[in-house]
Amino acid sequence: MSHHPKKVRIGLIQTTCGASPQDNLAKAVEWIRRAAAQGAQIICLQELFTSQYFCQIEDHRYFALAEAIPGPSTEVLGAVAAELEVVIVASLFERRSAGLYHNTAAVLDADGRYLGKYRKMHIPDDPLFYEKFYFTPGDLGFRAWQTKYAKIGVCICWDQWYPEAARLTALHGAQILFYPTAIGWHPAEKAQYGERQHAAWETIQRGHAIANGCYVAVPNRVGHEAPDGGPGLQFWGQSFIADPSGQILQKASPEQEQILVQELDLDALDVQRTHWPFFRDRRIDAYAGLEQRFLEDRNV
């Protein structure tokens, strides 16, 4: 029986972001067109691409940036998706209701249809990453969507530190796991901790690719942002794509705007999972403890 190899070309967009949401959306559309012109069929934008990273401070003014999903931005992007016949993953600030907001990724299929959304499950509260002030933790669980070109899953930035998130998304059948991201260096920490911070970030996501036998694709923003003065953040770019063995297929610049376009062989997932059968050997009867916050000594 003949078999036609299943391949797909994905695109990651790494750019700077300015103060105007309208300009940022227009820029995203322009770069989506560039990625599509290079052959990308599934295109992922970076986290919260319609604004600068406002979570560096806690300020109620920034709630005005939020919008409904589906809503104005997904309408624009859906039309572009249909025109170019590309799948788009778009990370947006979602206004769900009065006083209820999420950090959310919308998935638009190649015919422009809105397939659904993922709400960021893990919300950080670190210096210059004060997301708990703005975002309610997600309540939709981990998901995957069958698009025209591949079955994809989406997690967002801080989710990337949690193996459970990648695992559950892969168990929903995701062949490619996208992580739209906004991560960078605190200026006071870069000299001492910068190299190890970046290495840890890259390493753990390569590990997700290995453990789950899937592709991992991570678009990060780039450039220095200090929307309210102060030291700001230096976003380290270096968006990357890893294969199911954890090898980096492409990596972007730490300083420049860039598009990564990479062909992925989806048939390689079956080969990888057959030779490294981690799904086969999982002890699903032994993991109940993962539902606990911490496992106390039973003798106490």
Q: Where are these predicted regions, by residue range?
A:
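A short, polar/charged loop-to-alpha-helix boundary motif
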Residues: 120-134, 256-273
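Short, glycine-anchored, charge-dense loop/turn motifs used at functional sites
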Residues: 10, 107-115, 240-250
